[in-house]
Curated annotation (Swiss-Prot):
Pathway: Secondary metabolite biosynthesis; terpenoid biosynthesis. This is Sesterbrasiliatriene synthase PbSS. It comes from Penicillium brasilianum. Isopentenyl diphosphate binds at K453, R456, H485, R502. Its EC number is 4.2.3.-, 2.5.1.29, 2.5.1.81. Bifunctional sesterterpene synthase that possesses both prenyl transferase and terpene cyclase activity, converting isopentenyl diphosphate and dimethylallyl diphosphate into geranylfarnesyl diphosphate (GFPP) and further converting GFPP into sesterbrasiliatriene. A motif (NSE/DTE) lies at residues 238-246. Its cofactor is Mg(2+).
Length: 732
């Protein structure tokens, strides 16, 4: 690490072997340093803990048994190792941020789901009021009052970096609230893990603490190797926290919410805890090697500009952060506990929980206890999703009983199809046999597996605070909306010739256009059957009405593109209300039909405005957001020739509309994408025409109207904190 010399001002290099005793469970390979302000951080932690304990007691006088495990260890302090180059006048707040993260988890992990939601909503409402409306509201709970005072200090010190940090923290909380990893492969888990773990939040804490100011685009330019290191940090957290997390979820009866790679390897793949830990250590080392190799390669190609210098600080900060947190985690009392009630024997109970569908982990042998059973199937020579055990689990996850395949039994006795070595004629007069739906549903299952923001379900839950729809009906409505949404995405991707959906290849890339269309139609049929299960007979009429609106709205969009006809703003809004707003109205009307409670006329307006906001924001971000580029491609709406609101504004405010429409609608035969240079020209033209400022103004106006309409609904139906948080969050 000699190439890092001279880059530090507030820390000293450290050799792990100098600590006595050296943590026996430490296996990190990345370097770390120690801050010269460790004593100050330790004093802040002691003071913050006293305040936090007092606040917890004030919020819940009955709670006496909660123990908090924060930053301080017998060998040092979390901040000293994680952020050794923290600017001295930010050490106080940086320490509070870190301890808050630990103590917040301790509190929320100790309460039930309802109490957790109340605590989170109380804090979220105060944060979003500041971030979107510029209003500083005081939370109800004492612990949240401590938190917001700390966060106001963060914003007052460095608002730009502070906002990024707070946004990532909120995303981390959202990810935790939504997560459940039952029946998930390790590969799928690792893809989700970065968005759920605090690693990205920890990076933004580091940027604020060190005063690093970089655009999202610059950060993303090194994400291809930085993310491998962050994934290693996430898995490292899983490695050290597993015993603690298992114990907490076992006590709470919430094992389905256990977010841990060790749990996945044990439950889904049948590995023992020892085997799973060995695999996780190897995956962590791979990630650590990858970030170091990536950094060295980047250094060799980087120039000497100030931007490269700042980016270098950013990468080095992350490397040292991962190295320091690994050392801290290897011995911190937060993870190495003597008060757990569960044992290794209890943890072993989840090994191979789903015996009939064990998975095979790429790059690793099956569990030792299955090697003898799998050797005869030559697993090592072929790639399979699962492996055979001696109790009759086939290599594709189907169960066997007494040596016979259930799949064969469903399809009839194979021996009956043969007579004297020839095909039997009986097959031609056999009874009707219903075809399995797996093949038909495969494209839908793929698109459904891609991680989205789940905003529609959140919105329905918020609406149900007012409408009180019975749980069975509510689940059916959620199923209907989910099926219609995802099937429409499959068709949209075909009609738009899109290459990506949520950052992954579109469904028809794997299944073909014809099969994907067939799957979408099949899901439409399933949604009709779901609607028939609702109690109010008017629900079917509502369903067909809004499904018709969805298609007529989409037809306008497709017609304008195909014929190169620029719509008016009024026509555009009509299209949005039918195409995008259709699902919002469908969910509301079905909920109202199944609800025993009174509704409000303003609810329809609220959802109509929300649908418009979503579409216009999507139009805007498609052309301006780095995140959208990574998930959909660079300015994909221009490739589609889509008449988005920014394009409408440009065509009405440029002196040379022909220079815009010509490349959009007069392409060479078979050319799907515009040349990057053409896209850049159009974006520059939008900049000059004030298009993006116009779109921002429309969104600001719509958001104000949404909040005003929410006030009207709350006047009719009562306060709804969940809905207010969701709608405030739109303005971020």
């Amino acid at each position: 690490m000699d190439f890092l010399s001279g880059a530090f001002h507030y820390s000293d290099s450290v050799n792990p072997s100098k600590y006595s005793p050296r943590p026996s469970d430490y296996f990190g390979t990345l370097p770390f340093r120690t801050s010269r302000f460790e004593r100050e951080a330790a004093d802040v932690t002691a003071d913050y803990l006293r305040k936090w304990q007092k606040a917890v007691k004030a919020d819940n006088p009955e709670r006496k048994d909660l123990v908090f495990h924060g930053s301080t260890t017998t060998l040092g302090h979390f901040v000293s190792w994680a952020y050794p180059e923290c600017i001295p006048d930010r050490v106080d707040l940086c320490t509070q941020i870190c301890d808050f993260g630990f103590y917040w988890d301790d509190v929320t992990d100790s309460v039930n789901v309802q109490e957790n939601a109340e605590i989170t909503q109380d804090l979220a409402l105060a944060l979003l009021s500041e971030l979107t409306l510029g209003q500083r509201l005081e939370p109800k709970l004492e612990i949240n009052k401590i938190v917001v005072q700390m966060l106001w200090g963060v914003l007052d010190k460095d608002r730009k970096s502070g906002l990024e940090m707070i946004k990532f923290w909120k995303g981390h909380l959202d990810g935790q609230a939504e997560s459940a990893h039952n029946n998930m492969s390790f590969e799928e888990y690792t893809k989700h893990r970065l968005s759920e773990v605090g690693a990205r939040w920890a990076v933004e804490v580091g940027c604020w603490s060190l005063g690093i100011n970089l655009s999202r685009e610059k950060k993303d330019s090194v994400a291809h190797f930085v993310n491998k290191g962050l994934l290693a940090a996430a898995l490292m957290n899983d490695y050290y926290s597993f015993n603690k997390e298992f114990d907490e979820h076992q006590r709470a009866g919430s094992m389905d919410r256990l977010q841990n790679g060790l749990g996945i390897l044990m439950r889904e793949y049948g590995y023992t805890e020892t085997e799973a830990r060995s695999i996780l250590r190897e995956e962590i080392r791979k990630g650590e090697r990858a970030i170091m190799d990536g950094y060295i390669a980047w250094r060799e190609s980087a120039d000497s500009s100030s931007e490269s210098h700042e980016l270098n600080r950013y990468i080095v900060m992350i490397i040292l952060m991962i190295g320091g947190i690994t050392f801290w985690s290897s011995h911190a009392s937060r993870y190495h506990r003597d008060d757990l009630i569960t044992t290794a024997g209890d943890r072993a109970m989840i090994v191979g929980k789903f015996q009939c569908s064990m998975r095979l982990l790429d790059g690793y042998p099956p569990p030792n206890r299955w090697k003898s059973a799998t050797s005869s199937n030559d697993i090592s020579g072929r790639k399979r999703k699962s492996w055979s055990d001696s109790n009759g689990v086939d290599t594709h996850g189907a169960c066997y009983t007494n040596g016979s395949s259930n799949r064969a039994k469903r399809n009839g006795t194979e021996a009956g199809h043969k007579a004297n070595g020839h095909d039997s004629m009986d097959i031609y007069t056999a009874p009707f046999l219903k075809a399995p739906s797996e093949v038909c549903e495969a494209p839908y299952e793929y698109i459904n597996s891609l991680q989205g923001k789940n905003m529609r379900n959140k919105f329905m839950d918020a609406l149900n605070h007012w409408l009180c729809v019975p749980a069975p009906s509510m689940q059916i409505i959620k199923n209907i909306v989910q099926m219609l949404h995802n099937s429409s995405l499959m068709l949209d991707d075909i009609e738009d010739e899109s290459p990506l959906r949520r950052g992954q290849p579109v469904a028809h890339t794997f299944y073909g256009i014809s099969q994907t269309i067939n799957s979408a139609n099949f899901v439409y049929v399933k949604s009709v059957k779901e609607t028939s299960r609702l109690k109010n007979p008017i629900c079917m009429e509502i369903f067909t009405d809004e499904l018709s609106n969805l298609h007529t709205g989409q037809s306008l969009d497709l017609y304008w593109r195909y014929h190169g006809r620029c719509p008016s703003i009024n026509e555009y809004i009509m299209m949005v209300d039918n195409k995008t707003g259709g699902l919002f109205r469908l969910m509301l009307r079905l909920m109202e039909a199944e609800s025993p409670a009174a509704s409000s006329a303003s609810l329809v307006k609220l959802l109509t405005l929300t649908g418009r906001y979503y579409q216009i924001r999507d139009d805007y971000l498609n052309l301006t957001s780095v995140e959208y580029t990574s998930k959909k491609g660079f300015c994909e709406d221009l490739d589609e020739g889509k008449f988005s609101l920014p394009l409408l504004h440009l065509l009405n405010h440029t002196r040379h509309p022909d220079r815009i429409t010509a490349p959009l609608f007069n392409r060479a035969s078979g050319a799907r994408s515009l040349a990057r240079e053409v896209k850049v020209h159009i974006i520059q033209a939008m900049d000059e025409a004030g298009t993006f400022e116009y779109a921002q103004g429309v969104l600001k106006y719509l958001h104000e109207e949404i909040m005003r309409t929410l006030d009207e609904v709350e006047a009719d139906l009562g306060r709804n904190t969940e809905a207010r948080i969701l709608l405030l969050g739109l303005g971020l």
